[in-house]
Amino acid sequence: ASLKIYRGQALAARAYDYLNLVQIYQFTYAGHENALAVPIVTEKMSDEEMHNNPRATVQQVYDQIMSDLNQAAELLAGFDNGANKDQLDEAVVYGLRARANLLMQKWADAAKDAERAIAGGTPQSLAEVSTPTFNSATANSWLWGVMITPDNDVVQTGIINWPSHLCSLTGNGYTSGVPDGYRKVNTD
């Protein structure tokens, strides 16, 4: 893949992460735009700026999310993750943007983005959804997913999930090397 694709995927992944973080650490968008949410960290910040980074407002976080998704949509235009579905592509970006617009109660924009997200997909038939379903990323209706196999686990402990090796609560996570991470949590 080209650097353009990698950059688009990185922006989409950051938007996805902030979309989840802002929902976990603050009330939803409408009516709470000025409430403090989470700090925003970007690649343009210096180390000093990252370490002295106050919590951004909900509005600022959503502005960052939409900026990242808009850039990602441009960079990933025409890119399709194919049958593997383990990479962020243009359809996934529009799906994420639809979700962000729903949370901001921008219903018309959400509908447009959702239409763009599913335009290349194949909805499941009534017969398909009448049996246990939504359990395989190989389904035509899935936009993004990872097919977990014994060959693609990210750690050798038998735990096969993405955040398991990033967690600071484990002795084996990458973030466990940050000894004073919890002392830096803003309690305001």
Region spans (language model):
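Aromatic-anchored glycine-rich loop motif in surface-exposed flexible loops
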Residues: 1-78, 82
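Helix N-cap and loop-to-helix transition residues
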Residues: 54-57, 89, 125
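Aromatic- and glycine-enriched pocket-lining scaffold segments that form the walls
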Residues: 76-117
